[in-house]
Each structure stands twice: as structure tokens, then as C-alpha cells.
UniProtKB/Swiss-Prot annotation:
Chain intervals for the UniProt region annotation (Sigma-70 factor domain-3): 465-542
Region (Disordered): 177-204, 609-635
Source organism (scientific name): Rickettsia felis (strain ATCC VR-1525 / URRWXCal2) (Rickettsia azadi)
Listed name of the protein: RNA polymerase sigma factor RpoD
Principal place of residence: cytoplasm
HAMAP family (UniProt xref): Sigma70_RpoD_SigA (MF_00963)
The entry's keywords: Cytoplasm, DNA-binding, Sigma factor, Transcription, Transcription regulation
């Protein structure tokens, strides 16, 4: 790209900034996006720099600009409309340019995000009601399934017998924050935002201890109701295997209503719900596969698809159905039932096993699964609508945490995770707008991700919280005392053990690169050049070892070959390890005593003044052990 084009791109950004400052009007993300260079894909850093440039200049950046009116949500339900005349400026080339085709993920994300309308308070309530209705339908449907009833009973027993942790059964966060109201305080400093969850967040173990008795009591009641329902269902089916008999049972319906109310009060862990759904969906897939196989078999005998569906769907597949189809007027059905009698008997037996496992007739089970799937789709679609409409909120919060160790897109993704949690736990009846509620979750997700991922060497989040507390106290004491407080003073202020304070302050140090330049000159070298290598051999030691090796070889050469070999093996000279008398004896095929005698004789020869004076000079400088030849003089 030529220099003139680059200057032109910079002029567009500066022009937009100058106009916004002079007219004291805010800009939108679309304005910045259009002002970015079109002839090349801007990097994430360029987008961050552009956003920060406007923020530093005091220009507000809003999420959207629709029909020349920008709606700002202030507090709960107040809305102020600010009229902007940006589109009325004919000389503004920024507004006239089109984004065009691009494969840059940042631009595509902003473009798609801008295509979703913002939600009013009424829209948020309507979507929240859709989510609530879908959940209620799913809960009621699950409670009608004997599979779920058996799971509730097993979960209660595992919880009482300590085979299951409470956190594995329920959603602790939903219970932890049930009585909390997160405030959307925009005046919090960035430092406080990064640390606020430290004082407000209870540990999982503490929360479990607090709510465990209440959950056990509820699960005990649920387990008892489930046992009553299963017994009542068994009695009804023993009298008559007809669904209407059970549906008309007053006792069964009363207990079922109680079960639905109790289960609705507990926020079960998503994994526990998926466990029940997984079992039901698995059985449903088996049924579908059996029906498809039966349909293909029927088509081979000339039964049309529509005729098969008319006779199969809604019918109870048993021996009576088989007899009925034998009397069918259509020849194809008679031929199918007659020739495939064994296959149909086997299928009836398999369906009977499924009915026994599910506690429901096949048709009732399929209807129940269809209802659950429909409510699940309804809930997911409503959540999707709420999430997509609030993606702008994530960006507005994420930009405050730029240059904290994570890239801008990573901050957005972490914020989106917090947004999804906020949608799951949003309670519209409290009267707050969703943005007020979601801000806390988005901020928590981003700060937790920065604490968990921003450092080169990962530090656990709970340790990050302790580091922040100590650093904050250190700054406060610096302002009070006028000098840097010592570790002892910080420990006394926080009532924390001195060793822990020192350990945390040591961990808090940021790692630096060994390639960092030292000094102002280019020839000053790198930091790694000044760090001692503990494993490297000093030149003087290397020279001594080389000389010792040569002298030892000459001294041992004065012995007989057998004596030299025995000493080398016994002391590991020139070998990887030393050898025992037994091992040396096996090599020479003699006894241990004979090897000891040879060794003693050889050592006496080495202690002769003529030979020993050549090794005496190494006795003070050499290291003992590990095959050091100077050890021969001590033996």
C-alpha cells in the first residue's frame, strides 16, 4: 500500500475524531469500522488502537446509530434520545464508503453484530418469559418420566452417602448469587473492577456447607414423591395397561404436581439434566431405528409409506395389533405379517422391554420426548435472541480491559461466555434491565480470564486474589507512611503469616525475557549473558580433570593388565559406574576373595612414593567419589 493511501486512511480516522470532538457528538462502532482502511485487512491491534484513540480523546463510543437517533440506556428504564446530523454532512466521505467484501474476522463480527436490533425492557421480558416457559415445560415433561424419577432417587442416595458432591448435583453459582443484586456501577475504577469479586465471592466449600442441609431435605422429599409415583404407576398398569387409567388417578396427579413444584425450586447442574436427557434421547433413537427398519421391510412387501404410517403411528404394537393386521384387507399387510412373523414377534418383545425400562407406553414415551425437544428448541432460540441483542454490551465492557495481557478478541469471547451465563440466570421479575444484570457477569468472566490466562506462568485465581489484596494494601500503606512498607508491616496489617506474604510477593513478580538488552548500547549484550550456568564446567576444573585423566592412565599403566582392569572396574575409572567384588569376580571367573587380594596388592603398589607423588597434587583439588582417580590414594 502506498504512503499516500496510508496517509489517506489516517486522515479518515483523524477527520472522524475531529468532527466528533468539535460537534461534541458520540460515534458508533460502525463509524470506526467504516473509517478503517479498505484496501487491506486491519489487524486486531489497529482496531484496539482506533477505539482507544477515541476513548482517550473523550469521545463516547456507542453501540448503534439507527435512524439518526442514538438511544442510551440510563439506569433502569430511562432512555435519552440524542439527535445526530452526521448523515446530513455531504462532505463526510466516511459515511458514504461501503465495507465491501472482507474476510477479516473483526469486521465480519462487528458487521453481523450491528445487524441485530437492541431490545427494549418489554422485549427483554418477553424473551425471558419464553425462556421461563420452555424451562417449565421441560421440567414438567421430565418429571412425568419414570427414568427421571429413578435418577432423582439415586441422586438423593448418592448425596446422603457422600458418593456425590453437592456441586455435581446443583448449580452452586445460581444459589450463591440468589440473594445478590449486582449493580451496574460505571464509576468503579478498573482496579476495583478486577478485584471486586474477591470480597463478594464465597468459596465453593463454604457455599456447599451452608446450603447442603436444605438441599438434602428437598431431595429427600423429591425421592419420597418419586417412590410414591412409581408405586402408583405400577398399580395402575397392573390393573389395565391404558394411559387413561393413570391420567385419571387423582393421587398420581397430586403427587406429580408436588414433584414438579419441588424440582422447579432446585437449580440442577446442567450435567445432571443432560444425564436424564441422554438416557431418554438414546432410547428414542433406538425406537426410531427400529421403526425405520420395520418401514423398509414393509415397503419390500408392497406396503406404501403412507399406509404404514396410518396403521403404525398411534397404535400399540403387541400381539393384538399383529392379529388385527392379519385381518387387514390389504394383501401386502397379510403377506408381511405371515412371512415375517418371527421378526414381528421379536420387535414386539423388544418394544415390551423398552416400555418396561421407561415405565411408559412407546407412544406416550415418544410424545414425551417430542415435547421435551420442542421446549428445548424454544429455550435455546430465546437465549440466542437475548445473547445476540446484547453483544454490543460485551464490547463496551471489554474495551475497558484492553492492554491487560489478553487480545481484544479474546476479551470479547470471554465476555460472551459471561453473557451466556447471565442469560441463563436472568430473573426479570426483580425489575432490572438485563444490561444491569449482565454487566456483573460479563465483568466477572473477563477479569477471571485475565487473572487465569494473562500471565506467562499461570497462577491460580485464588492466589491472584491474594496478590491483589497485598498489592492494594501496600499502596495504601505507601500513601500513609511515605515509604514502601516491609513484608512484616504488610503481614501485621492483614493479619497474615509473614511467610505467606513473602511467598506471595515473590510469586507476584513478572517474568522477563533472557533476551532483554542490557545497557543503552547495542553491544551491551543480553540479560541471559550475565546469568551463571550452574551446569557448566569451569575452565580451570576442566583442565584439572583432563590432566588428572592423563596422569591416572600413565600411573595405572605401570601395573599389570589384570591389576589395572580390576582397579578400573572397582573404582569406575573410565566407566559409567563402579562394580562390586562379585561382579568383578564374574568377569575374571575367580572368587570375590581373589579379587580383593588383587585389589589390595595393586593399591599397595600405587601407594609407593614413586607412583603416589604423581597423584598427590590432585588430592586437594579433585572431588572424591564417582570414579575420581585420586580416591585410589585414600583406599
Amino acid at each position: 500500500m502506498s504512503n499516500s493511501n496510508i496517509d489517506n486512511d489516517l486522515d479518515k480516522i483523524d477527520s472522524l475524531l475531529k468532527k466528533a470532538k468539535s460537534k461534541k457528538i458520540p460515534v458508533t462502532y460502525d463509524d470506526i469500522n467504516k473509517a478503517l482502511p479498505l484496501n487491506k485487512n486491519p489487524s486486531i491491534r489497529q482496531l484496539e488502537e482506533a477505539i482507544l484513540k477515541f476513548s482517550d480523546a473523550g469521545v463516547d463510543i456507542l453501540e448503534s446509530n439507527e435512524d439518526d437517533e442514538i438511544k442510551l440506556d440510563i439506569g433502569m428504564d430511562e432512555e435519552f434520545k440524542l439527535s445526530t446530523n452526521v448523515d446530513n454532512e455531504p462532505e463526510d466521505e466516511v459515511e458514504e464508503e461501503n465495507i465491501g467484501t472482507t474476510d477479516d474476522p473483526v469486521r465480519l463480527y462487528l458487521k453481523d453484530m450491528g445487524g441485530v436490533d437492541l431490545l427494549t425492557r418489554e422485549n427483554e421480558v418477553e424473551i425471558a418469559k419464553r425462556i421461563e416457559e420452555g424451562r417449565k415445560t421441560m421440567t414438567a415433561s421430565l418429571c412425568k418420566s419414570p427414568i427421571a424419577m429413578r435418577c432423582f432417587i439415586v441422586w438423593y442416595e448418592d448425596l446422603v452417602n457422600e458418593k456425590m458432591l453437592l456441586r455435581d448435583l446443583i448449580d452452586l453459582e445460581a444459589n450463591m448469587l440468589h440473594d445478590e443484586t449486582p449493580e451496574n456501577d460505571e464509576e468503579h475504577s478498573s482496579e476495583t473492577e478486577g478485584e471486586e469479586h474477591e470480597d463478594n465471592h464465597l468459596s465453593m466449600s463454604r457455599v456447599e456447607t451452608q446450603i447442603l442441609p436444605n438441599i438434602i431435605e428437598r431431595m429427600k422429599k423429591i425421592s419420597f414423591i418419586c417412590e410414591e409415583l412409581l408405586i402408583e404407576a405400577k398399580k395402575c398398569y397392573e390393573k389395565s395397561f391404558e394411559p387413561k387409567v393413570l391420567q385419571n388417578s387423582k393421587k398420581y396427579n397430586n403427587n406429580l404436581e408436588l414433584l414438579i413444584n419441588e424440582v422447579s425450586e432446585i437449580h440442577f447442574n446442567s450435567k445432571r439434566t443432560e444425564e436424564i436427557l441422554g438416557k431418554m434421547y438414546g432410547i428414542n433413537r433406538d425406537l426410531i431405528n427400529k421403526e425405520i427398519a420395520f418401514l423398509k421391510l414393509a415397503e419390500k412387501y408392497g406396503v406404501t409409506r403412507q399406509n404404514f404410517l396410518d396403521e403404525y403411528i398411534g397404535s400399540v404394537i403387541n400381539a393384538a395389533w399383529k392379529e388385527k393386521m392379519l385381518k387387514n384387507k390389504k394383501v401386502a399387510w397379510k403377506e408381511l405379517i405371515t412371512k415375517e412373523s418371527d421378526y414381528i414377534d421379536q420387535m414386539i418383545a423388544e418394544l415390551s422391554v423398552i416400555e418396561s425400562n421407561t415405565g411408559l407406553l412407546v407412544n406416550d414415551f415418544k410424545k414425551l420426548v417430542n415435547t421435551i425437544q420442542k421446549s428445548e428448541r424454544q429455550t435455546l432460540q430465546a437465549k440466542k435472541d437475548m445473547i445476540e441483542a446484547n453483544l454490543r454490551l460485551v464490547i463496551s465492557i471489554a474495551k475497558k480491559y484492553a492492554n491487560r495481557g489478553l487480545q481484544f478478541l479474546d476479551l470479547i469471547q470471554e465476555g460472551n461466555i459471561g453473557l451466556m451465563k447471565a442469560v441463563d440466570k436472568f430473573e426479570y421479575r426483580r425489575g432490572y434491565k438485563f444490561s444491569t444484570y449482565a454487566t456483573w457477569w460479563i465483568r466477572q468472566a473477563i477479569t477471571r480470564a485475565i487473572a487465569d490466562q494473562a500471565r506467562t506462568i499461570r497462577i491460580p485465581v485464588h492466589m491472584i486474589e491474594t496478590i491483589n489484596k497485598i498489592l492494594r494494601t501496600s499502596r495504601q500503606m505507601l500513601n500513609e507512611l511515605g515509604y514502601e512498607p516491609t513484608a512484616t508491616e504488610i503481614a501485621n496489617r492483614l493479619s497474615m503469616p509473614l511467610d505467606k506474604v513473602r511467598k506471595v510477593m515473590k510469586i507476584a513478580k513478572e517474568p522477563i525475557s533472557l533476551e532483554n538488552p542490557v545497557g543503552d548500547d547495542s553491544d551491551g549484550g543480553q540479560l541471559g549473558d550475565f546469568i551463571e550456568d550452574k551446569n557448566a564446567v569451569a575452565p580451570i576444573d576442566a583442565a584439572i580433570q583432563s590432566n588428572l585423566r592423563e596422569v591416572t592412565t600413565r600411573v595405572l599403566a605401570t601395573l599389570t593388565p589384570r591389576e589395572e582392569r580390576v582397579l578400573r572396574m572397582r573404582f569406575g575409572i573410565g566407566m559409567n559406574t563402579d562394580h562390586t567384588l562379585e561382579e568383578v569376580g564374574q568377569q575374571f571367573k575367580v572368587t570375590r576373595e581373589r579379587i580383593r587380594q588383587i585389589e589390595s596388592k595393586a593399591l599397595r603398589k600405587l601407594q609407593h612414593p614413586i607412583r603416589s607423588k604423581k597423584l598427590n597434587s590432585f588430592r586437594s583439588g579433585g572431588k572424591r567419589g564417582e570414579g575420581n582417580p585420586s580416591d585410589l590414594l585414600e583406599a
